Design a protein with these regions (language model features):
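Active-site beta-loop-alpha junctions of metal-dependent nucleic acid enzymes
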Residues: 20-41
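Short conserved beta-strand segments at catalytic cores or DNA/RNA-binding microdomains
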Residues: 2-14, 23
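Extended amphipathic alpha-helical interaction segments
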Residues: 44-151
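Secondary-structure transition/capping motifs at alpha-helix termini
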Residues: 9-14, 38-45, 63-67
Length: 151
């Protein structure tokens, strides 16, 4: 059974458990039920950080329509690992990860665009182009790149 764990973060960066519940599955309905359980206790988050799961995102929009969602970079990086490491190859993986980190850790839009352009140029070869396309379609699509956060 999946566990829905709501965590809060203090202004000093400390985390604490707000609550948790077991879900019958991982569908939009399951997540919506879990979020409504929290809502019954007047838990109204200012922002929700998710792993990118569409069912979760849809449930948040249903239950907490005015709450913005952000993407957890750790989970994004796990997806990048599972989708790109075999294509990039073990010998180039560390370099690929370092270049990807410079993209996602950019502090300004200008720095991001510059780093992304360098990344695309460096990995515009038959071996890694599929990874570049994956990153662009899955994680850097319009409006998505601004939602990547370290949590």
């Amino acid at each position: 059974m999946p566990l829905l764990h709501m965590i809060g973060i203090t202004s000093s960066g400390l985390t604490f458990s707000i609550g948790f519940c077991f879900l019958p599955g991982e569908t939009q309905q399951d997540f919506a039920w879990g979020f409504r359980c929290f809502q019954e206790y007047s838990i109204s988050p200012k922002v929700i950080i998710i792993d990118g799961d569409q069912a979760q995102k849809n449930a948040i929009e249903e239950v907490f329509p005015n709450t913005p969602t952000l993407l957890c970079i750790w989970h994004v990086n796990q997806c990048v690992l599972s989708n790109c490491k075999a294509l990039v190859g073990q010998e180039d993986w560390e370099s690929f990860q370092a270049a990807w980190r410079t993209v996602i850790q950019a502090r300004t839009a200008l720095e991001f665009d510059d780093n992304w352009g360098k990344f695309q140029a460096k990995y515009a070869n038959p071996k890694t182009q599929q990874c570049v396309t994956y990153l662009q379609k899955e994680w850097l699509k319009l409006g998505q790149k601004e939602r990547l956060v370290k949590a």
